[in-house]
C-alpha cells in the first residue's frame, strides 16, 4: 500500500512540475541549435492566409490544392512562435504555399480578445473536429475536409519543409 501511495505522489509531482514549466522561445532555439539562415528568413513575407474554413474548402476544391490548417497558440505557445518565424516567414515556404497550398491559421489564443467571437468559435470547432491536442500542429485536409496528413508538436524547423513538400507531391 505504501508503494502505491509513494508512486502516486511521485507521479503527481512529476506531472505537476511538467505542466508548470514555461517554455521560452530563447531556450527552445538554444537547445535546438537552429541555423535560421538555411531557410532565408524574411520578416516582410506576407502569406495568403484564408479567413474562414468554408472559404478554404471552396478554394481547395476550385484550385485542387490541399488545405494546410496551422493550429497555433499565438500568444502563449513558444514552439509555435519559433515555427511561425522560421518556416512561415521564409521565401521558400511562400513560394511553395502560393503555388500548392490553401493556408488556414487556426489560432487558439489564451487572450480571447485577439480574435472575433466568430473566429474563436470556428477555431475551437476545428480543434475538436480534428482532435488536435498539441501545438503547433500542421494538419492537411482535402476540399471535403478529410484529413490527409498531420504533424503535431515541434521538431527542428528544417524537417517541416520536406514533410510539406511530400504532402503536396502526394496530393
Spans of features found by a protein language model:
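Thiol-based oxidoreductase modules, predominantly thioredoxin-like and allied folds used
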Residues: 48-50, 86, 93-121
